[in-house]
A protein has these predicted regions:
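TRNA-recognition modules of translation machinery and tRNA-sensing kinases, especially anticodon-binding
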Residues: 1-217
Length: 219
């Protein structure tokens, strides 16, 4: 039943985002990502979580899991200083695993949308504004997976990147936030169960100008 529910949701999303629009193209790109892409996007340096080790029980924790510097496993305060831990899975390319030729499993579906932007532009003769949508697997090497489905190492994303002129970005951002709210309500979620959260400026990703999260707070 779970897989059918997921497939129905994916199909409904694709229908609304691609089939029923004339300004969005669909994409199905590779899971493997060139390190150059993630280097220049900033992910190699900044796609990290702060990590601390407990010197007594040898467990590892994200910094946001620690309260008052106490290990949740054994109660020790003998913790290492937090250090950045990169969340991307690295894999070797070719027959020799000597570290010289490698790629990453994509941490998001966005990167291939950006790297294929020119291909989509040339093959469809489009002009901005237009969007590119993609669904598929993404991978993150979580330090401590858990929290139901919210901290897992393999997961599925449904993503749209919408390209517009710089002076129209705020207008389109507001449009898409409201569009996503309306779509989720159409799927049967009650308005009082949908929380809209605007991230503060100091909590934005390194590539983000603004972020609005929609969260299901009750079922």
């Amino acid at each position: 039943m779970g897989v059918e529910l997921k497939n129905n949701l994916k199909q409904a999303w694709w229908k609304a985002m691609v089939w029923q629009r004339d300004d969005v193209e669909g994409l199905d790109a590779s899971l493997l990502t060139s390190p150059n892409v993630l280097k220049y996007s900033g992910h190699e340096d900044t796609f990290t979580d702060p990590l601390s080790d407990c010197k007594d029980c040898k467990s590892r924790w994200r910094e946001d899991q620690l309260t008052d510097g106490i290990c949740p496993n054994c109660g020790s305060k003998n913790l290492t200083e937090a250090r950045p831990f990169n969340l991307m899975f690295k894999t070797s390319i070719g027959p020799v695993d000597d570290g010289s030729s490698y790629a990453y499993l994509r941490p998001e579906t966005a990167q291939q949308i950006f790297t294929n932007f020119k291909n989509v532009l040339d093959s469809t003769n489009r002009a901005v504004p237009f969007g590119v949508a993609q669904m598929g697997k993404s991978f993150r090497n979580e330090i401590t997976p858990g929290k139901f489905i919210f901290r897992v190492r393999e997961f599925e994303q449904m993503e749209l990147e919408f390209f517009c002129k710089p002076d129209a970005d705020e207008e389109w951002f507001k449009y898409w936030v409201q569009s996503r709210i309306d779509w989720w309500l159409e799927q049967g979620i009650k308005k009082e169960n949908l929380e809209v959260f605007e991230a503060p400026q100091d909590d934005l990703s390194h590539y983000s100008k603004a972020t609005t999260d929609l969260s299901l707070i009750h079922i």
